[in-house]
């Protein structure tokens, strides 16, 4: 069964089924960045309350059980990862690094040859670029990057081809 759920991103498109997943898998603990804890149950912050989302149900989810600690190593039933701060798309953006699998879940921070939006509440372009350069681009170049949207990439590919990181 599911032993935990880690939220890189609090946007409604990433969390809309969270309570259903919790219920279906016996309420595993949920981890979020402390700075975004209230976003799970605040529609204006998780973006489900925006006028442009008329087709999405307003989300008021149960609170998370735990907060991430940056650079802390987590082991959930054999899945070992650590948390890197990659704010900028949102104030509490994080990326999850799985060293044994040689990959990172970058949420909405880093995409193939692009980066996340910074025009939403608490977005900050400079903070996003700094976080990506200081945290993600120091990972081994062969690491795969799995973003919150779109195709996978690698650290090497982004160093070479991402126009935002030049």
Predicted regions and their residues:
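Single conserved hydrophobic/aromatic residue that forms the stacking wall/gate
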Residues: 1-4, 8-9
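Short, active-site-adjacent cap segments at secondary-structure transitions
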Residues: 13, 38-39, 152-155
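Metal-dependent catalytic neighborhoods of phosphoester/phosphodiester hydrolases
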Residues: 16-26, 157-158
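Acidic/polar short surface loop at catalytic or gating sites that assists cofactor/ion binding
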Residues: 28-64
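Short acidic-hydrophobic, aromatic-tinged amphipathic segments that line or gate anion-handling sites
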Residues: 65-70
């Amino acid at each position: 069964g599911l032993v935990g759920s880690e939220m890189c991103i609090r946007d409604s498109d990433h969390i809309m089924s969270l309570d259903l997943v919790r219920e279906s898998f016996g309420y595993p603990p949920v981890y979020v960045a402390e700075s975004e804890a209230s976003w799970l149950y605040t529609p204006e912050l998780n973006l489900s309350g925006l006028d442009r989302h008329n087709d999405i149900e307003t989300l008021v989810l149960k609170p998370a059980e735990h907060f991430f600690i940056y650079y802390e190593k987590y082991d959930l039933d054999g899945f070992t990862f650590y948390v890197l701060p990659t704010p900028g798309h949102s104030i509490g953006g994080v990326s999850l690094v799985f060293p044994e699998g040689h990959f990172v879940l970058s949420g909405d921070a880093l995409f193939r040859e692009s980066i996340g939006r910074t025009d939403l509440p608490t977005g900050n372009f400079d903070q996003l670029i700094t976080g990506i350069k200081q945290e993600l681009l120091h990972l081994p170049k062969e690491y795969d990057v799995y973003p919150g949207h779109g195709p996978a990439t690698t650290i090497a590919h982004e160093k070479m081809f991402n126009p935002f990181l030049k």
